[in-house]
Amino acid sequence: MREVLGCLAVRLAVGRMPEDELSSFEDLFRELLNHPSYEPAEDLLEVDRAFHDLVLRCSGNRWLMDIAGLLLDRSQLIRVISHKHPGRMEESWHEHLGLIEAIRGNDAAAAERWALVHVANARESVIQSIMP
């Protein structure tokens, strides 16, 4: 479900995201990549959620914002497990940077591919964490 909603949100958000917000998140993700041992995890999850909320808001679709936002709320524990998997946070920041680059380039297809990669990698990290 996250794949479908996330890809739709990203596709709709291309061309609608304010450059200043994209730049702020880009700077933040690059800073986090330069300091991979940063903690606490709650702060990192807040950054991740804020970026997802920006994408949803910029989709311009109220229904999508509500449903996908609820899904993100309900999957918080899964997101915590995913982010605790070794190397997942850094991988996630790279995925977000790829998504930003695609959005900035007005490339909806590339943005959608990055969204799919992001969700697939998150799912795989959860599976590896709970079924070692």
Give residue spans per PLM region.
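Short, charge-rich amphipathic alpha-helical segments embedded
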Residues: 118-132
